């Protein structure tokens, strides 16, 4: 299999998807995309995977839709056994490949780890995850151990201007208009 061990590992790696189970006998794999538009995962190259603690670059040879899935063919992956070795590998790219966003737009990866504080100064905790609900994104905030309200996790809608008052990526903080009791 033609995977390249690379000294040029992604500087700021970001996971864009995951390889699923093999498909057929010629080395095809199902692929699951985390990008907003599933097909956008193919716009970002090269892809990296991590096997046994080593970064490896893989080259996309082809992709296509198959029923509800997308399947991929990687260069050098020519049979089912080789494809099975890549099942569950995360597809990683360097975040420098992502397009620049307009003012007030943020990548979820940039919000992770930010401290969330109410407009009154109450520390709600840190962003540990994000959820897409259809109507708006939601911050998943892990509360501080000694939270005065006994809350372990908070879900705060990412509604710019209404709930989210200020995002400062330099200080890694988000100011929200939110009742800490929720």
Swiss-Prot record:
What does the UniProt entry report for the null mutant? Disruption causes slow growth, incomplete processing of 17S rRNA, accumulation of 30S and 50S subunits and decreased translational efficiency. Altered levels of ribosomal proteins in 30S subunits; uS2, uS3, uS14 and bS21 are severely depleted, uS5, uS7 and uS11 are decreased, distortion of rRNA helix 44 near the decoding center. Slightly different results show ribosomal proteins uS2 and bS21 are not found in 30S subunits, decreased uS3, uS13 and uS14 in 30S subunits.
Pfam family membership, one: RimM
InterPro entries in UniProt: PRC_barrel-like_sf (IPR011033), PRC_RimM (IPR056792), RimM (IPR011961), RimM_N (IPR002676), RimM_N_sf (IPR036976), Transl_B-barrel_sf (IPR009000)
Ranges of residues in domain PRC barrel: 103-182
The UniProt entry, under Gene3D superfamilies, shows: PRC-barrel domain, RimM
Record-stated family: Belongs to the RimM family.
In Swiss-Prot or TrEMBL terms, this protein is called Ribosome maturation factor RimM
Q: What organism is listed for this UniProt entry?
A: Escherichia coli (strain K12)
Gene for this protein?
A: rimM
């Amino acid at each position: 299999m033609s995977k390249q061990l690379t000294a040029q590992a992604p500087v700021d790696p970001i996971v864009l998807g995951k390889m699923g189970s093999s498909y057929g006998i010629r080395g095809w794999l199902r692929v699951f995309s985390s990008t907003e538009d599933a097909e956008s995962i193919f716009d970002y190259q090269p892809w990296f995977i991590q096997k046994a603690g080593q970064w490896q670059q893989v080259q996309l040879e082809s992709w296509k839709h198959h029923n509800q899935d997308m399947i991929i063919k990687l260069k050098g992956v020519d049979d089912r056994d080789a494809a099975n070795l890549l099942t569950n590998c995360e597809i990683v790219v360097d975040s420098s490949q992502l397009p620049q966003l307009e003012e007030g737009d943020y990548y979820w990866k940039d919000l992770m780890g930010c401290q969330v504080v109410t407009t009154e100064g109450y520390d709600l905790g840190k962003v540990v995850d994000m959820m897409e609900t259809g109507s708006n994104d939601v911050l998943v905030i892990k509360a501080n151990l000694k939270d005065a309200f006994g809350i372990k996790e908070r879900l705060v809608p990412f509604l710019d201007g209404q709930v989210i008052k200020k995002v400062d990526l330099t200080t890694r903080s988000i100011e929200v208009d939110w009742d800490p009791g929720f």
